[in-house]
C-alpha cells in the first residue's frame, strides 16, 4: 500500500462518482429517488407488532424477500448479517454506477489502496445476537452459532465490502446515532481530501425491524401514535401537527474519489463534496439543544471547511425527523447560521417518505441530495400541510420543485448530541 502523510500533501478535491441505496421504497438508488420525487411512501403497518403492546404499529421496512443477491450467495450469505448484506449490495450498486465493476461484477481498476468509511448503530444486534442469546438460554453453549462473532459486530459491514472487492485501504466504522451516515461520508471525504486514499466507499447501513427496538423508542415517546390506521400521513416533518417519527431502515453508499483519480479513469462525476464537520450539543442524551447552537456549530464549521459563505447555500437537506423539539431546534440552527436568508432557502426532509432510518438516514438523504444536484429537482417533504410559525422556513411541501442548485448542505443530528453537516456541490471544472 502506498504510504501517505496528511501533512505532506495539498488537500485534494473530492467527487462523487457512484451511488447505491436500499430503502423501504425500493432496492436501488434510482428507484428510491423516483419514488421520493413522485411523493411515494415506504411506511407501512408492521406485521410483527402486537397492538396490545406497541402504541406505534408502523415502520419503513425494507422488503427482505426482494433484496438483491448479486454479490453474496449460499453459505456465505447465510453467515452474513442483514446489515452487512445490505451494505454490500448498495456498495456494489454504487460501484457499478461508478464504472468500477465489469459484467462479472469484478473490479476493473486496482482497489488495493481504496478504503471504506461505514457506519451502523445496531449492527446485527437484533438479527443475530438476540436470537443466539435465546438459543443459548434454551439449548446451551454447544448450540451457539460458531460464526456469531463474525456476524453481529458493527465493523463487519466494512469488512464484507472490502473483502469482496479487494479494498485494502483505510477502514473505519462509526456509530454516532442518527448522525452516523453523514459522518461516515464526511470521514470518507476527509480521508481522500488529506491523501489517505484515492477512493473510498462511504455510507451507512441499518436493520431496525425488531419489536424490541421499536419498544425502546416507544418507551421514549419518540414514535408517532396517531396514525396506525393512516400510515401515509404518519411522518410529518416540520408540519405543525407532527407527533413523532416512524422507524425506517436501509443502506446508502457512495463512491468518493480524488478528482485526479476519477479523471484519469474517465469516470462520470455526479457531484463534489466541498466540506464536512461534526459537533456535539453537550446538552442532553436525548433532547436536542433547544436553541440549536450545537447544530449551528457543525453547519458553520462545515461551511468553513468548504471555504463557502452562508450566502452561497441554495438548498438545505434537513434532518427533520417529525418531532416537536427536534424540528424546531433544527430550524433555529438554520436561522442562526443563515440569518435573514433562512426563510428563502428551500428546505426539504425525506423522512415523510421512508421514516427515520437511524444510522442510514444521513447516507440515504445524501444520495437524494446528490440526485437533487444532478436532476435539478428538490424532492418534497411529504405531509407538510400546516406551517409551524416556530419553524418559519421555505419548506418544499408535498410536490417536488424544479431548481438548479449549485451548492447545498445536508444536516444530520442524533442522540447523544451528535451533529454532522456536509456541503455538497454540482461538479464544475474550477
Q: Where are the language model's segments positioned?
A:
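Short, well-ordered amphipathic alpha-helical segments that serve as non-catalytic structural scaffolds
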Residues: 86-99, 157, 257-259, 292-307, ...
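Condensing-enzyme catalytic core mediating Claisen C-C bond formation in acyl metabolism
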Residues: 13-17, 40-45, 230-306, 314-315, ...
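Conserved small-residue
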Residues: 18, 36, 91, 116, ...
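Active-site-proximal alpha-helical scaffold in enzymes
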Residues: 87-100, 154-157, 162-165, 171-206, ...
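Conserved beta-ketoacyl condensing-enzyme motif
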Residues: 16, 40-176, 205-214, 310-326
Amino acid at each position: 500500500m502506498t504510504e501517505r502523510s496528511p501533512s505532506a500533501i495539498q488537500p485534494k478535491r473530492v467527487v462523487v462518482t457512484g451511488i447505491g441505496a436500499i430503502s423501504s421504497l425500493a432496492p436501488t438508488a434510482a428507484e428510491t429517488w423516483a419514488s421520493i420525487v413522485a411523493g411515494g411512501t415506504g411506511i407501512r403497518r408492521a406485521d410483527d407488532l402486537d397492538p396490545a403492546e406497541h402504541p406505534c404499529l408502523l415502520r419503513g421496512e425494507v422488503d427482505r424477500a426482494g433484496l438483491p443477491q448479486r454479490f453474496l450467495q449460499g453459505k456465505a450469505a447465510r453467515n452474513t448479517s442483514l446489515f452487512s448484506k445490505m451494505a454490500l449490495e448498495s456498495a456494489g450498486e454504487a460501484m457499478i454506477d461508478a464504472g468500477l465493476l465489469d459484467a462479472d461484477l469484478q473490479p476493473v481498476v486496482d482497489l488495493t489502496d481504496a478504503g471504506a468509511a461505514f457506519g451502523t448503530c445496531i449492527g446485527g444486534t437484533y438479527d443475530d445476537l438476540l436470537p443466539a442469546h435465546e438459543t443459548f438460554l434454551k439449548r446451551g453453549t454447544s448450540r451457539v452459532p460458531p460464526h456469531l462473532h463474525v456476524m453481529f459486530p458493527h465493523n463487519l459491514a466494512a469488512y464484507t465490502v472490502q473483502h469482496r472487492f479487494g479494498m485494502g485501504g483505510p477502514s473505519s466504522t462509526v456509530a454516532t446515532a442518527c448522525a452516523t451516515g453523514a459522518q461516515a461520508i464526511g470521514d470518507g471525504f476527509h480521508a481522500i481530501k488529506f491523501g489517505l486514499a484515492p477512493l473510498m466507499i462511504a455510507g451507512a447501513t441499518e436493520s431496525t425491524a425488531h419489536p424490541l427496538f421499536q419498544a425502546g423508542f416507544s418507551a421514549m415517546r419518540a414514535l408517532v401514535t396517531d396514525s396506525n390506521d393512516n400510515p401515509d400521513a404518519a411522518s410529518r416533518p416540520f408540519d405543525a401537527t407532527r407527533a413523532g417519527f416512524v422507524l425506517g431502515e436501509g443502506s446508502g453508499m457512495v463512491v468518493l474519489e480524488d478528482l485526479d483519480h476519477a479523471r484519469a479513469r474517465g469516470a462520470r462525476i455526479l457531484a463534489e463534496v466541498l466540506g464536512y464537520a461534526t459537533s456535539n450539543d453537550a446538552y442532553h442524551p436525548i433532547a436536542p439543544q433547544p436553541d440549536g447552537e450545537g447544530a449551528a456549530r457543525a453547519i458553520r464549521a462545515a461551511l468553513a471547511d468548504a471555504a463557502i459563505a452562508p450566502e452561497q447555500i441554495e438548498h438545505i437537506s434537513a434532518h427533520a425527523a417529525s418531532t416537536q423539539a427536534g424540528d424546531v431546534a433544527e430550524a433555529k440552527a438554520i436561522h442562526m447560521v443563515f440569518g435573514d436568508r433562512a426563510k428563502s432557502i428551500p428546505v426539504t426532509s425525506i423522512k415523510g417518505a421512508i421514516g427515520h432510518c437511524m444510522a442510514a438516514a444521513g447516507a440515504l438523504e445524501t444520495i437524494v441530495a446528490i440526485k437533487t444536484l444532478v436532476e435539478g429537482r428538490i424532492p418534497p417533504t411529504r405531509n407538510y400541510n400546516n406551517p409551524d410559525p416556530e419553524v418559519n422556513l421555505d419548506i418544499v411541501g408535498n410536490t417536488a420543485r424544479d431548481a438548479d442548485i449549485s451548492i447545498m448542505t445536508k444536516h444530520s443530528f442524533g442522540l447523544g448530541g451528535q451533529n454532522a453537516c456536509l456541503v455538497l456541490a454540482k461538479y464544475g471544472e474550477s
